[in-house]
């Protein structure tokens, strides 16, 4: 069971630390204080994960069992790589038998058992390169992609929703029957067309907000389980 970390008793670092750097802007100092005092950040360091985001995936899996039996996984917006770490472990991926492909336009340090593509997912060549990298039909596509924020809520929401839509269409194109799709989204409404498309192609579609997401964050996750196969998509087009 993925439990919430207990403050300060496992990492050797107490919570409630203050940053005493008068040269830093107040906003930067507040961000750094929140980061170093975040129990999930401390737990990620203790357990060897590259980011606290690992616990979001583990928490979602604890309830929805999307990692169970996964043989090949594609990780979109993967940097710095904590989801890919989990994916490599559950699939048994090794450098000699790659079963996890990860993509991000940001540079990522290499991970055992993960084929990393430093490439914008919106690049037209990305889908083919990902399929080649993962070495077969994936049964899970996970996306933690979010557009760089502008400070304008509506603009940020629309840009991230576009990434969700592109990722969803990619998942429908590549998943094996029975596969799952998980993507980050923002509170503020999921586009009606996207939900309709997912419900047409998957047996269950739900919104999830794991406890490890910061309370003040507008992020949520959209989970589509049980891909019906490309036959379902074809039947919808004919109707």
Curated annotation (Swiss-Prot):
Belongs to the class I-like SAM-binding methyltransferase superfamily. RNA methyltransferase RlmE family. Its EC number is 2.1.1.166. This is Ribosomal RNA large subunit methyltransferase E. The gene is rlmE. Pfam families: FtsJ. S-adenosyl-L-methionine binds at residues 81, 83, 104, 120, 144. Residues 11-20 have a biased composition (Basic residues). Keywords: Cytoplasm, Methyltransferase, rRNA processing, S-adenosyl-L-methionine, Transferase. It comes from the Bacteria.
């Amino acid at each position: 069971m993925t439990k919430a970390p207990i403050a300060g008793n496992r990492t050797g670092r107490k919570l409630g630390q203050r940053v005493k750097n008068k040269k830093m802007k107040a906003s930067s100092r507040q961000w750094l204080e929140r980061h170093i005092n975040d129990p999930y950040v401390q737990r990620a360091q203790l357990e060897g994960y590259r980011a606290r985001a690992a616990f979001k995936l583990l928490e979602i899996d604890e309830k929805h069992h999307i990692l169970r039996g996964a043989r090949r996984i594609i990780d979109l917006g993967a940097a710095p790589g904590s989801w890919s770490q989990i994916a490599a472990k559950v699939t048994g991926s090794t450098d000699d038998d790659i079963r996890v492909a990860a993509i991000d336009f940001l540079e990522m340090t290499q991970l055992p058992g993960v084929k990393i593509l430093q490439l914008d997912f919106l690049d037209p060549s990305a889908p083919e390169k990902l399929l080649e990298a993962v070495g077969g039909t994936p049964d899970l596509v996970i996306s933690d992609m979010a557009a760089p924020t502008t400070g304008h809520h509506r603009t940020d929401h629309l840009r991230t929703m576009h990434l969700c839509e592109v990722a969803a269409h990619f998942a429908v194109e590549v998943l094996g029957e029975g596969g799952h799709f998980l993507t980050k989204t923002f509170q503020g409404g999921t586009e009606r067309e996207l939900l309709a498309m997912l419900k047409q192609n998957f047996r269950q579609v739900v919104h999830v907000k794991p406890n490890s997401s910061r309370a003040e964050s507008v992020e949520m996750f959209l989970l589509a389980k049980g891909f019906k196969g490309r036959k379902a998509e074809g039947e919808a087009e004919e109707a």
